[in-house]
Amino acid sequence: MAPKIFIDGEHGTTGLQIRTRMAGRRDVELLSIPEAERRNAAMREDMLNGADIAILCLPDDASKEAVQMVSANNNVRVIDTSTAFRVNPGWAYGFAEMDKQQADKIAAARFVANPGCYPTGAIGLIRPLRAAGILPDGYPITVNAVSGYTGGGKQMIAQMENPDHPDAITAPHFLYGLPLTHKHVPEMTVHGLLDRAPIFSPSVGKFAQGMIVQVPLHLDDLAEGTTMESIHAALVAHYAGQDIVSVVPLAESKALPRVNAIELEGKDTMKLFVFGTPGASQVNLVALLDNLGKGASGAAVQNMDLMLAS
């Protein structure tokens, strides 16, 4: 019998993307409730408890409520895509390539917290350097990023695509998170192995899907002898054997005139780059991904597959 999967919040942006990725699969059975019944708590609870894996695509408070609905049922495993549990030590963090053991931890877990889109890029760049001893304690990390507007859900999609919307956004690019308290900072800090919270400056561009995350570094303030080449080598070693996360060769990066934010639109992979001038004292680390792919729905399906294979 095929394992039963219930997407709680299947009619939202992330939920719809997960359904699209699972369309046509015969190895799982998708449970579903009509959109008109999506707020029917009794029906949701029945579906949640009838699933082998429940994928929660809900706001934080609603996710916490859903977890309570299945807390006594050890037969139900949960993947949550909100920020509610990402730094909870009782939950496996769903970035399978984060370190060599993480995929196994996800596979064995009952509760998996799907990473945020921005943290996937930031942690993907930062954690290997912390693990390798290149990035010292106390280093003042800055993370700058731009996302496609689908990351803001249905409300922002309407604001960006409908010029008649009462709160229409006409700017081709805008900065937000201005008080520097974005909800993704805690998971960047914890899973990036940082002892000091980064300064995170997110922004949104007038494109639907895609993301660029940048982490600029001063080599003089890193471990003695660190070069652009040694940073690149550390990333290559960390992701050796991985298919979903790849490190672009330095020669290929050097030849690029630009990085296109929508290059990986519709894909569930992530590319990492190291930019700079050999012998200079600065580098810029860049992660490229689809905010709805490896940054959300693609990661959720990847985590589901790891859990089903265990």
Swiss-Prot record:
Keywords in alphabetical order: Amino-acid biosynthesis, Arginine biosynthesis, Cytoplasm, NADP, Oxidoreductase
Broad EC category: oxidoreductase
Associated pathway: Amino-acid biosynthesis; L-arginine biosynthesis; N(2)-acetyl-L-ornithine from L-glutamate: step 3/4
Catalytic residues in the record: C117
Keyword Transcription regulation: no
A GO molecular-function annotation: N-acetyl-gamma-glutamyl-phosphate reductase activity
GO CC terms of this entry: cytoplasm
InterPro entries on file: AGPR_AS (IPR023013), AGPR_type-2 (IPR010136), NAD(P)-bd_dom_sf (IPR036291), NAGSA_dehydrogenase (IPR050085), Semialdehyde_DH_NAD-bd (IPR000534)
EC number per UniProt: 1.2.1.38
HAMAP family reported in the protein's UniProt record: ArgC_type2
Protein family membership: Belongs to the NAGSA dehydrogenase family. Type 2 subfamily.
Stated role: Catalyzes the NADPH-dependent reduction of N-acetyl-5-glutamyl phosphate to yield N-acetyl-L-glutamate 5-semialdehyde.
Protein name per Swiss-Prot or TrEMBL: N-acetyl-gamma-glutamyl-phosphate reductase
